[in-house]
Amino acid sequence: MKKNRFTYGLALGALGVVFGDIGTSPLYALKVTLSGIPINQFNILGVLSLIFWSLIIVVSFKYLMIIFRADNNGEGGILALLALMKHKSTKYQPLFYIVAIFGAGLLLGDGMLTPAISVVSAVEGLGTLSDKLYPYVLPIASLILILLFSLQATGTGRIGYLFGPLILVWFITIAILGILQIAEHPVVLKAINPYYAIAFLVDEGLQGYLLLGGIFLVVTGGEALFADIGHFGKNPIRFSWFFAALPCLLLNYFGQGANLIVRPEAISNPFFMIAPSWFYLPLIIIATVATVIASQAVITATFSLTKQAVLLGLCPKIPIVQTSMLHSGQIYVPQINFILFIGTMAFCLAFKTSDNLAHAYGIAVNLEMLLVDAMVAYAAISIWRWSIFNVMFLFGLFLLIDLAFLGANTHKFITGGWVPIVLAFFIAFIMYSWRYGLEYLRDNFYMNKEDISKILKQLQYKSLNQLPGVSAIFITDVYDKSGGSFLHFLKLSRSVPENVLIVNYIVDNIPYVHYSQRYEIVCLDEKVCKLVIHYGFMETINIPRSLEKACNKNILPFKFNVDTATFMVEIPNIMASKEKRSLSFYWQEKLFAFLMRNYSANLNIEFYKLPYNRTIAIGTYCIL
């Protein structure tokens, strides 16, 4: 009984986070799809049939039944998939990196468009009250978005528990509105028959095919189901989809279609015009709340994706702020929030209406779905051990469908869809350059590493100036496992603290690391030890807290107080070589050197959660 209550609770929570994006698509999807073609029963049934089978095949079958199998120890998303691939393949790792970082860039671009189109489409409902209110749509939507991004720093912990019930109210509302229309014109239920979808595509030809770009809007947000596995689990998400989101969405789409059959003029805003006039204002309020929640879910997912990228070494250690002491998943990334805000506002001000935004929306998500399909297909062969025939048949079907959508979406590239794609390339270049630079640094430190034991003997450890009562913790970065900061300190000061701990952290290719696998320790001397701390890519790196737990568990051979110990971090000064090898490498080196110089000691201190008043930065120099 308790297990069922827990599942229902997670399912309700999933409604508010996972289905906000796909759940608000009825605001604009049918309007965009049917605009430009005759509003008659044949066309309406054809479009509704395409919507029905798109939701069944792409979301219900592909994502919930197949893609869900490719989780990484309970975590989903394209970067979690990358970490899983690193376990299983070395041959194709460079390709996986390129695919994953480009996919991550596409999701960031989507994070700008989704809040814009969702909020604007909801506020456009004011036009149903009076034409005089249309000029106020953009200012009101902009104000809502400004408030939304401004409040990110405070976190959503206090109101987050309301998201599920509020989205449930949204789904119930749109379902009832749809049922009322279907009851009057049940002929729309014929659209469940795939014949109408096929007949529509055959009859309309090229124009019908291009309308698939509008149909694709009903499945945007489906990628969020896979990305949010770790937050809620597979079964609660499936339960929420099949018993709440899917039936409510279909009822509303079919209700809009039923209304359009008898009132073709309702195409100006088919979502709001299925409601009675007295319900317009309450519906606008409910829709606006739902779109804000959907936007919040996208923003939070982008923050989570950024955290994964930082921990996997795909981007610099930008500041990540924990907004909740109880829930590690509630984070705020100031720089990403600012980028999303600027991008979202730029889209709103440039495109002005939901129709215009829809002509730029979808192509980035479409490409990301294709990349996930390809990676999961490889996982099916290498991890699940499916036969080549089964993989080619099933994923060939998925790729065929996604490529068909992509072909229909290509015209969106010139109407604004190029923006998230160009942004994705830019982000991918930054990530690839960062990864390339870290690998170079790792190789450089490895080739020039020094044996600490030999150095201690050469410096006559016993004759060095002793610092009694002083405990020093030297933190080395992922590219330097030899303890370079400690060696620099010894050579410069010719003094040694009473207790020395050289700490290196490793982010494993799993979301969470069990306590029994958290620590590795090697002692070089009775007072000098090297400690490796393992983290998962979904965890928060907190060196002082991890050391405190290690002390409490008597893992270290000596006692020291973390609250009084001195921390030392290594800050490399990277310079790009003046030797020109190739233009791409040259610019990668320049970019990496710039990023390293600008992620200063302060960012390292924040990233490791070190106390500012007890941390010393030790500089090093390296030429790429």
From Swiss-Prot:
Name the major location: membrane
Q: Mention any one GO cellular component term assigned to this protein in its UniProt record.
A: plasma membrane
Coiled-coil ranges (or none) = none
Show the InterPro entries listed in the entry: K+_transporter, K_trans_C, K_trans_N, Kup
User: Where in or outside the cell is it found?
Assistant: Cell inner membrane
What's its membrane topology?
Multi-pass membrane protein
Question: What is the catalytic activity of this protein?
Answer: K(+)(in) + H(+)(in) = K(+)(out) + H(+)(out)
What keywords are assigned to this protein? Answer: Cell inner membrane, Cell membrane, Ion transport, Membrane, Potassium, Potassium transport, Symport, Transmembrane, Transmembrane helix, Transport
Organism classification: Bacteria, Pseudomonadati, Pseudomonadota, Gammaproteobacteria, Legionellales
Output the Gene Ontology terms for molecular function.
Answer: potassium ion transmembrane transporter activity; symporter activity
Family that this chain belongs to: Belongs to the HAK/KUP transporter (TC 2.A.72) family.
Residue ranges spanning the membrane: these are 10-30, 48-68, 94-114, 133-153, 159-179, 210-230, 242-262, 270-290, 331-351, 363-383, 388-408, 413-433
Q: What is this protein called?
A: Probable potassium transport system protein Kup 1
Q: Which Pfam families match?
A: K_trans, K_trans_C
- Is Transcription there in the keyword field? no
Q: What does this protein's UniProt record list under function?
A: Transport of potassium into the cell. Likely operates as a K(+):H(+) symporter.
